[in-house]
């Protein structure tokens, strides 16, 4: 019975570089498709909060799944809110309301204040 193919080890500390595969002579080199992830951003936040702490690739994978899950929940809720109010555009207001409804108490307050700060910084830089 043939053994299942083993996958390549996960890249360390949020690297997103393209990896090239080498094949037989005469064949062209084929680049691996880029895997998008939030790992570089998770790593940056980790270093802001705990500069001397590292993170394993397994833990980084869990954090990436978590961020993707929260993103999908917020986007879905914001989409529903826009639809209920007969709007075709998701604005920062829909995102803010979605965050308030999805996240509990103090966490929602912090998320809203950080989001407002980010939007203000973005609009002032334009």
Swiss-Prot record:
GO CC terms: nucleosome; nucleus
Skewed-composition ranges (Low complexity): 1-12
Domain of life: Eukaryota
Biased composition (Basic residues): 13-34
Post-translational modification: Monoubiquitination of Lys-121 by the RNF20/40 complex gives a specific tag for epigenetic transcriptional activation and is also prerequisite for histone H3 'Lys-4' and 'Lys-79' methylation. Phosphorylated on Ser-15 during apoptosis; which facilitates apoptotic chromatin condensation.
Record location of the Glycyl lysine isopeptide (Lys-Gly) (interchain with G-Cter in ubiquitin) cross-link: 121
Modified residues (N6-acetyllysine): 6, 13, 16, 21
GO MF term (any one): structural constituent of chromatin
Pfam families: Histone
Record keywords: Acetylation, Chromosome, DNA-binding, Isopeptide bond, Nucleosome core, Nucleus, Phosphoprotein, Ubl conjugation
Record bears the keyword Ubl conjugation: yes
Subcellular location: Nucleus; Chromosome
Region (Disordered): 1-36
Residues bearing PTM Phosphoserine: 15
Family: Belongs to the histone H2B family.
Described purpose of this protein according to its UniProt entry: Core component of nucleosome. Nucleosomes wrap and compact DNA into chromatin, limiting DNA accessibility to the cellular machineries which require DNA as a template. Histones thereby play a central role in transcription regulation, DNA repair, DNA replication and chromosomal stability. DNA accessibility is regulated via a complex set of post-translational modifications of histones, also called histone code, and nucleosome remodeling.
Assembly and oligomerization: The nucleosome is a histone octamer containing two molecules each of H2A, H2B, H3 and H4 assembled in one H3-H4 heterotetramer and two H2A-H2B heterodimers. The octamer wraps approximately 147 bp of DNA.
Protein's recorded name: Histone H2B
Organism: Cairina moschata (Muscovy duck)
